[in-house]
């Protein structure tokens, strides 16, 4: 029941999106950050590459989960394969890791800047 309820909410989110909007909604932002945070939480190592435009989480199986910019979206790839859109309508992404915390800054197509931070559990002895 919980899964179908969550799925219905996500489908509604994408079907009800206004096409003329050049950015993304707050709900899309929150879902995307939650996905990235969960990958980092379940990883044995987290690092950035390409001057912060790529966030790489190495999971317990040794797979590299990579979040990078592709056209106007952030996508997720596993070991360089696949293509899962995470957040659309972006122009820039910058990730840093400081003192066990991922600092993420994203600029949308409508020139808004979004920032967040979340702990990297592998640095803190968890995960």
UniProtKB/Swiss-Prot annotation:
The cross-references to InterPro entries, in alphabetical order and at most eight, read: Competence_ComGF
Where in or outside the cell is it found? Cell membrane; Fimbrium
- Topology term for the membrane: Peripheral membrane protein
Q: Name one GO cellular component term.
A: pilus
**Pfam families from the UniProt entry:** ComGF
Query: What stretches pass through the bilayer?
Result: none
- BP-aspect Gene Ontology terms: establishment of competence for transformation
What UniProt keywords apply to this chain's record, in alphabetical order? Cell membrane, Competence, Fimbrium, Membrane
Q: How does it assemble?
A: The transformation pili are flexible filaments, consisting mainly of the major pilin ComGC and smaller amounts of the minor pilins, including at least ComGD, ComGF and ComGG. Interacts with ComGD. Interacts with ComGG.
Q: What does this protein do?
A: Required for formation of the type IV-like pilus (T4P) that plays a role in transformation. Involved in transformation. Transformation pili are dynamically extended and retracted, perhaps thereby promoting DNA uptake and transformation. Required for transformation and DNA binding.
What protein is this chain from?
Competence protein ComGF
Species annotation? Bacillus subtilis (strain 168)
């Amino acid at each position: 029941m919980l899964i179908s309820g969550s799925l219905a909410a996500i489908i509604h989110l994408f079907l009800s999106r206004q096409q003329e909007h050049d950015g993304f909604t707050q709900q899309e932002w929150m879902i995307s950050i939650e996905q990235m945070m969960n990958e980092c939480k379940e990883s044995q190592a987290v690092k950035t590459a390409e001057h912060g435009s790529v966030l790489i989480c190495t999971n317990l199986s040794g797979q590299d989960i990579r979040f990078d910019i592709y056209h106007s979206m952030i996508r997720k790839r596993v070991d360089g394969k696949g293509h899962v859109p995470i957040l659309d309508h972006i122009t820039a992404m910058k990730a840093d890791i400081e003192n066990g915390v991922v600092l993420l800054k994203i600029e949308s197509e409508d020139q808004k800047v979004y920032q967040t931070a979340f702990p990297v559990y592998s640095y803190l002895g968890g995960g």
